[in-house]
């Protein structure tokens, strides 16, 4: 392991829950306004994850007032306070960009069904 990899490894966050495209996420973001800071939640469907390592980012899409809003978050950014997985989605694609063209019920994603272990 070279020096750059070692530095990147120590700066990466450790408490990130496993999630995939299709999952509904609630991302808590730190917002600084002047000398005050607050945490704002952004809830939507993860439509993609890009790259890997410390440069990894993910895109979350939600519908707000009948307008689609997408935000790209760096995964290991200090402005991302927490990530919660609300529901797991069952999709067969890695990038869900086709959701941009769909409206209403057509844009729904099936929920993944779990079988309880016995």
Swiss-Prot record:
What cellular-component terms does GO give this entry?
A: cytosolic large ribosomal subunit
Pfam families of this UniProt entry? Ribosomal_L19
The UniProt entry's GO biological process terms, in alphabetical order, are: translation
Q: Which domain of life is it from?
A: Bacteria
Instruction: Tell me the PROSITE patterns matching this sequence.
Output: RIBOSOMAL_L19 (PS01015)
Keyword terms, alphabetized: Ribonucleoprotein, Ribosomal protein
Single GO MF descriptor: structural constituent of ribosome
UniProt lists the family membership as follows: Belongs to the bacterial ribosomal protein bL19 family.
The protein's job, in short, is:
This protein is located at the 30S-50S ribosomal subunit interface and may play a role in the structure and function of the aminoacyl-tRNA binding site.
NCBIfam families assigned to the protein according to its UniProt record, in alphabetical order: rplS_bact
**HAMAP family, per this entry?**
Ribosomal_bL19 (MF_00402)
| The name this protein goes by in its record | Large ribosomal subunit protein bL19
């Amino acid at each position: 392991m070279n020096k750059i990899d070692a530095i990147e490894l120590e700066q990466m966050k450790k408490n990130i829950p496993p999630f995939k495209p299709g999952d509904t996420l609630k991302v808590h973001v730190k917002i600084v306004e002047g000398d005050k800071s607050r945490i704002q939640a952004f809830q939507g469907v993860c439509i993609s994850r890009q790259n890997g390592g410390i440069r990894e980012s993910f895109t979350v899409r939600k519908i707000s007032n009948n307008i689609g809003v997408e935000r790209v978050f760096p995964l290991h950014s200090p402005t991302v306070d927490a990530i919660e997985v609300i529901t797991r989605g069952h999709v067969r694609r890695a990038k869900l960009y086709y959701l941009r063209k769909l409206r209403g019920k057509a844009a729904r994603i099936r929920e993944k069904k779990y079988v309880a272990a016995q």
